[in-house]
Design a protein with these regions (language model features):
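Glycine- and other small-residue-rich loops at beta-strand/loop junctions that grip anionic moieties
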Residues: 50, 76, 169-170, 195-196, ...
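Amphipathic alpha-helical repeat scaffolds
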Residues: 80, 172-179, 292-297
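RNA substrate-binding interface of SAM-dependent RNA methyltransferases
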Residues: 89, 104, 115-118, 124-129, ...
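Structured adenosyl-cofactor binding patch, chiefly the S-adenosyl-L-methionine
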Residues: 145, 183-187, 196-214, 271-310
Length: 310
């Protein structure tokens, strides 16, 4: 029964199987939709509509593109259907979801919004022009969420007997860090540890490049010295990558408890890691370039470890 002051909102779905949502990167299976109208009760009415570029919420969303306002508020932005869906799947407590139907790319957005509302997020409908103002993507899909930041410590990690870890030091570019997280997820890494970061792990482009994997891979930010001591305590070998290493990455033993350590784009690993690693390895280079993109080098080394372990 609908109580006084409540509003019934109905969405009509026309699929009897998993819906498909295209988002520029291929099709993805998503929520189960049934061929009838699903009605839900909105306790305090329909989502607030915002069309003014001067609205305080719009101004705050624009500010959250920068690190200081994000850290002060303890939140960050999650843009995109796929990224928001993965956040919900991992039970991230989204605080707010902003949507603009004029930008929608598929048919499943209403179900995603309903899932977010059910999970406790506050919904706001934006005009097309207003959403273009707050979106940071060149081609937005009409969905933007505000999520709480979190901090996980080394002691919070639950690891198997022979974990595969990825340690990255002083990564500078958000796109590289996001790609590294995505690759670590694909390789089945048990955790990613970011040492002495230059870029913010909650940068919108980290979220974007990771395709939302930021929410599924255990992620710790810590100082290099503490990470090295923690690895030693747990008898996890640290294998550092450097072009000067005498051993090819394919010739090294990458089985057992292992942490692969990657350095920054410009300078590679610091002397601290090169001196304190249990072993160093290199990827052979045949051309004029003296190094690979750090994300590509990470992928190559990680999947060699995966190959050896299977």
């Amino acid at each position: 029964m609908v109580g006084e002051g409540q509003v019934v909102e109905c969405f009509l779905f026309g699929h009897g199987t998993h819906g498909i949502h295209g988002n520029g990167g291929g099709e993805e299976k998503d929520f189960v939709f049934w061929p009838f109208s699903v009605c839900s009760v909105w306790p305090v009415g329909l989502p607030e509509k915002i069309s003014s570029l001067q609205n305080p919420r719009v101004k705050q969303l624009v500010k959250l593109r920068d690190r200081r306002p994000r850290d002060e508020a303890g939140v960050f932005l999650v843009e995109g259907y796929r990224e928001i869906r993965r956040a919900l799947e991992k039970q991230v407590a989204l605080q707010e979801v902003y949507f603009a139907p004029d930008w929608f790319l598929g048919e499943n957005e209403p179900a995603l919004l309903e899932a977010a509302r059910t999970a406790g997020a506050q919904l706001f409908e934006l005009s097309k022009e207003t959403f273009a103002k707050v979106a940071y993507r060149e081609r937005p899909d009409g969905l933007l969420a505000v999520a709480p930041q979190w901090k996980q410590a080394l002691g919070d990690l639950t690891l198997p007997a022979a974990p595969l870890l990825l340690v990255v030091e002083a990564i500078e570019k958000p796109g590289n860090l996001g790609t590294i997280l995505r690759s670590a997820d694909a390789a089945g890494c048990d955790a990613v540890i970011v040492c002495d970061p230059v870029t913010d792990i909650f940068n919108p482009n980290v979220v974007r490049a990771s395709t939302g994997v930021l929410f599924s891979v255990p992620l710790v930010v810590e100082e290099s010295a503490r990470v090295r001591a923690w690895l030693q305590e747990r008898k996890i070998r640290a294998v550092a990558t450097t072009p000067a290493a005498p051993t090819l990455y394919t010739a090294a033993d990458l089985r057992g408890p292992l942490a692969i350590v990657m350095g920054s784009e410009q300078y590679g690993l610091s002397d601290f890691w090169l001196k304190n690693a249990d072993a160093t390895v290199r990827i052979p280079m045949a051309g004029q370039a003296d190094s690979l993109n750090v994300a590509m080098a990470t992928i190559i080394t990680l999947f060699e470890a995966v190959r050896q372990r299977h």
